[in-house]
Design a protein with these regions (language model features):
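Short, positively charged interaction helices/loops
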Residues: 47-85
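Short Lys/Arg-rich basic patches
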Residues: 1-17, 26
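Short, T/G/N/S-enriched strand-turn elements that build extracellular solenoid repeat scaffolds
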Residues: 65, 80-93, 104-117, 132-137
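Short, basic amphipathic alpha-helical segments that act as recognition/interaction helices
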Residues: 2-3, 20-21, 28, 32-56
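Detector for repetitive beta-architecture
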Residues: 62-63, 74, 93, 97-99, ...
Length: 137
């Protein structure tokens, strides 16, 4: 699989009053920088919503059925897995949140035969030919 960094840059508008409080905490050593504070706050918010997230994951997995590869986090296929799926006549649809990766040495024609569609809220790492075929950014 690709060794690309599994993070994305996000722009957020924060009002001056809130930002000044973050800066006060950073300047006094509570956080190493603004990004550290924001990442900590996001992790805390996700922890607070863990039961909701778990319930939504379960609902999506049940709803997707066996012909869909549903995921959250990081997922993907190696060239070997694509070859095996192709040989067995397996077809799938990829749906998920996070990062989906296909080995860059995957045979594009086999990928097209195996994966009917790819819909990822996040990032897809694959060859330009595969991105173009599925209309991915």
């Amino acid at each position: 699989m690709s060794k690309e960094v599994l993070s994305e840059k996000v722009s957020v508008n924060i009002n001056t009053s809130t930002l000044s409080q973050i800066d006060l905490l950073v300047d006094n050593g509570y956080y190493s920088n603004r990004s550290d504070f924001i990442n900590h706050a996001l992790r805390s918010a996700l922890d607070e919503n863990r039961s909701t997230i778990d319930r939504l994951i379960e609902q999506n997995q049940k709803r997707s059925g066996t012909d869909h590869a549903w995921f959250i986090g990081v997922s993907g296929y190696t060239a070997k897995e694509i070859d095996e799926m192709f040989e067995s006549g397996e077809k799938t649809t990829v749906l998920g949140y996070g990062v989906f990766m296909l080995d860059h040495n995957c045979d594009a024609e086999k990928v097209f035969a195996v994966i009917e569609s790819i819909k990822v809220r996040g990032k897809t790492v694959c060859s330009p030919e595969i991105k173009k075929h599925y209309g991915l950014k």
